[in-house]
């Protein structure tokens, strides 16, 4: 673990100091908006279906485009919220956390929708939240299974929702706090700070997308065509 991430992990419990007025509830709000859509941003299923149609029904290519689009969104969102230099740094963290959560939830939801999972199913939603955690952290947590196993479970444990919400909120805040430390020097030149933040957000989003792509197999009835 990097120095920045270790410091971020230490700071994460102090949510009110890092991101005032932010609570774990923002995770569910981000997930809801990601699935239903917000403003001019269509919901996850509609956006994913469009990518699938543009690739002539090829699920592999459609999934690839969903990931690539959201990696770009994450980079742009990170750039926008990390510009401004040291003076505005304390005020941009909540926007960065909530915006990135929405982008990543939308990407994961789009992929699992293409694989045949119902986005209104609480099991699917719990699996989506699980995917926002670092892959190594998922392996260390005491969970009833992998994200795909959670989405496919015969019985849903409602207490899992609270556990996952808190874990995801902590993880997102840890990343943001660690990134703040890592980019402080860069922020003395605001554009440099923006580029560093954009790159970090895009890379984490790409890692999550690749993990989801590997983790979720198409459900029965979904035709799977690999790219040639």
List PLM regions with ranges:
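Terminal, membrane-proximal amphipathic helices
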Residues: 1-79, 106-228
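Short secondary-structure transition/capping motifs
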Residues: 64-68, 93-100
